[in-house]
Each structure stands twice: as C-alpha cells, then as structure tokens.
C-alpha cells in the first residue's frame, strides 16, 4: 500500500497556512488521494500538493501520515519523484516515457516560470499567441502530425525570442514584435538512454523555452506554411482543448492560458 505523507500547516501564503502532501512511491496515487480530499489538480506543484490548513485534519483522517517538513523533503528526494526547479518556479507535471517524432523517448518536466532559462541550455522555443478576443493561434505540424502552438528548433546563434518569432512567421505568416513575447515557462527534456538513436539531441541542451504573446488585433491574417497542409487557425478555448489535450505540453498550456479553474476555499 502506498503511503501518503503530510507535514503540519506552517507555510504562510495568500493569508493562509499550508501543508505539503507527497507520495514517496507514486504520483498517480498522490493525485487520487488529493482528489478524494477535494483538492483541485491546480494545487499540484510537480512533485507535491500544497494543502490549505483547513484540509489538514481531513487528510489525516483519510490516511495521510504526519511527518516533519524536513523528513518529508528527505523522503521526496530519496523517492526519485522530486522535480527540481529554481526558486520561484512552479512545477506543473512530469511526463514520463514520451515518444517524440524522431523516435526517441524522454521524460519531460513542465515548469511555469516568468524567467527565461540559461541561454546555452535552450535548444528550441514555442509561443502561445492570443488575439485581443482571447482566441488562440494553432498551427499544424506535419512532422508531429498534430496541432500546437508555433515553435521549433533554434538556428545558428539566434536568441530564444528570435527563435520563437521566426517559427511563428514561418508557420503562420504572423510577424510578432519580439517585445510582445514574455517568458511563461519551459519544458525540460531528459532523453531515455535506452532509445536506439540520439535523434537531434545535443548534450547539455535540454530546455524548450515557452513564451506567450497577447495581441491587440482581432484574428490577424495568417497563411498556410506549405500547400496541401492544414492552415493555421484562430480557435476558442474549447476547440484548443479538443485538439491539443492529448499533447504532452497540455498541462503547461492549460496553466499558462488560465484554462483551469483556481482552487476555491471552503
């Protein structure tokens, strides 16, 4: 039986005290336990849940085991489930064993952050684009056979922002002002060493930088990248979810684009 651990509510934020809830064996079991308490998935921080103080006794009554904050951190680190991140960043999800278009497999950490990662680690960039009415720009990737936000690999010595701007123009014809792009998160890739071929991986370059851009125009004109392929489209929230919900990056997109409801206090 999987043990769920919790520390006493001692962490102040947003005018409340909070506990941390972890599993040292299974993230899936942790999600199930939190859902049983009525804690929204939005409370998940990539390797633990932040639990408001008013849920603490309920968690204990449901089978969580109390421990100190220090012991809880030790158990999380020893479990291999810890999602490392910089101070101020927010872990969203670890996607494990994802097969990429080049045939390689990777574990992918999705992290929310208002700061760019170190330039030399960034191998690619993407940008979530919204028009003034809140519609989302989607482009079709023939290589990946899926809809998504404009993005791709860096070329030459271009900056990550220039990378995102170029990809948006190539894939949709939309010319973005680099000043409109703001960093909102990143995807950290760890390639499965048992994958037969390294694909396009370069050691030390493991980050896809994610930006967002909010435009002041309604549905700016876009054009198809290549004849015979589906053209880019402006879509509403529901359509975005229907087309992209199965993509590995969806949990990060949902958080960046505020497509999830925030937790409601009792």
Q: What is each PLM-predicted segment?
A:
Residues 2:
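Phosphate/adenylate-binding glycine loop and adjacent helical scaffold
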Residues 17-47, 54-58, 62:
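Basic nucleic-acid-binding interfaces
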Residues 33-37, 58-61, 67, 91-101:
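Alpha-helical and coiled-coil interaction segments, frequently adjacent to or embedded
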Residues 46-84:
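Short, compact, well-ordered microdomains
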Residues 73, 80-126:
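Acidic, metal-coordinating catalytic segment for phosphate/diphosphate chemistry
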Residues 130-170:
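Conserved Nudix-box catalytic region and its N-terminal flanking loop in Nudix hydrolases
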Residues 154-248:
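Unchanged
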Residues 244-266:
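Charged phosphate-binding loop/patch that engages nucleotide di/tri-phosphates or the phosphate backbone
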